[in-house]
UniProtKB/Swiss-Prot annotation:
GO terms for cellular component: fungal-type cell wall; fungal-type vacuole. The gene is PAU17. Belongs to the SRP1/TIP1 family. Seripauperin subfamily. The lineage of its organism: Eukaryota, Fungi, Dikarya, Ascomycota, Saccharomycotina. The keyword Ribonucleoprotein does not apply. GO terms for molecular function: structural constituent of cell wall. Keywords: Signal. This is Seripauperin-17. InterPro entries: SRP1_TIP1, Yeast_SRP1/TIP1_CWP. One of its GO terms (biological process) is fungal-type cell wall organization. It comes from the Eukaryota. It comes from Saccharomyces cerevisiae (strain ATCC 204508 / S288c) (Baker's yeast). Pfam families: SRP1_TIP1. Residues 1-20 form the signal peptide.
Length: 124
């Protein structure tokens, strides 16, 4: 038998979760806020899998990255301000250019955008 206090606690937890959910915003995939979330995930992924990125870069020496990304990877402070102003096409190119984009980066980016209440849509 379930106690009423357990039910009340469950209802309170659900209500708190709903209240804590961020407001949703629909943005263009090229919006700088979307790019900053994507780059934040990318920088975190590089930090977590640095050897893979080094091997990828060694195999693709002509692949270039914005200098701001390298600075953000090795600066363990708040790097988000370093990443502003990188053109959306460069963000897309570097993030989608690695073999693990579909399996690791895209799901992490989707999760991060959703956690921030951001959804993307291509403008008509």
């Amino acid at each position: 038998m379930v106690k009423l206090t357990s039910i009340a606690a469950g209802v309170a937890a659900i209500a708190a979760g709903v209240a804590a959910a961020p407001a949703t915003t629909t943005l263009s995939p090229s919006d700088e806020r979307v790019n900053l979330v994507e780059l934040g995930v990318y920088v975190s992924d590089i930090r977590a899998h640095l050897a893979e990125y080094y091997m990828f870069q060694a195999a693709h020496p002509t692949e270039t990255y914005p200098v701001e990304i390298a600075e953000a990877v090795f600066n363990y402070g708040d790097f988000t301000t370093m990443l502003t102003g990188i053109p959306a096409d460069q963000v897309t190119r570097v993030i989608t250019g690695v073999p693990w984009y579909s399996t690791r980066l895209r799901p992490a980016i989707s999760s991060a955008l959703s956690a921030d209440g951001i959804y993307t849509a291509v403008p008509n």
